[in-house]
Amino acid sequence: LQSILDACASGDLDARVAIVVSNHAGVPALQRAALAGVPSAVFTLRTYSDRAAAHSAMATAIAGVGAELVVLAGFDHILAPVFFVRLAGVPVINLHPALLPLFGGRGMHGDKVHEAVLASGATESGCTVHRVHPETVDLGEVVVQRRVPIEPGDTAATLAARVLELEHRAIVDAIRRFVPVEVSR
């Protein structure tokens, strides 16, 4: 989130963060939003009767601020179909810490991804920003990928740190592809 906020503030990205939503209270993204003056909201499953109700409320909040793109970064739920219905026509993208289609799918998040990459003997890893579609996990069209070599002695933590650096640039580059370009005449 911070890289997006910084890119918007510097003018590097001609966009604004309209709202930050989370499915967990107390996460750093909510603190970053508050410091940047961006509204935020939390939609935990404990607060709602089920996943569909939580995701419907989340989509309503996002639509209410006029968002034209939804960016998932650190969001760890599979979005209910109602989310996409409520936000019809609004693209949804996700940041994944591996080179999809490898090392994606259900359960592949956090350190599990980097551990799987290292256990596979892969020579490189990276990150992927991809489109999100209803009831799918890490299967949408790739928007941006960035690569990093696996170094001798890498651990899940050291690899994760290098991939995170790529993620900060990749997400801004991906958002830029959805921002309308103004043509000068």
Labelled PLM ranges:
Residues 7, 23, 69, 73-182:
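Donor/substrate-binding cores of folate-linked one-carbon enzymes
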Residues 27-48:
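Conserved nucleotide-sugar phosphate-binding/catalytic loop shared by glycosyltransferases and other
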Residues 34, 63, 118:
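Anion (oxyanion) recognition and catalysis
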Residues 42-67, 72:
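Glycine/small-residue-rich loop that forms an oxyanion/phosphate-binding "nest" at active or ligand-binding sites
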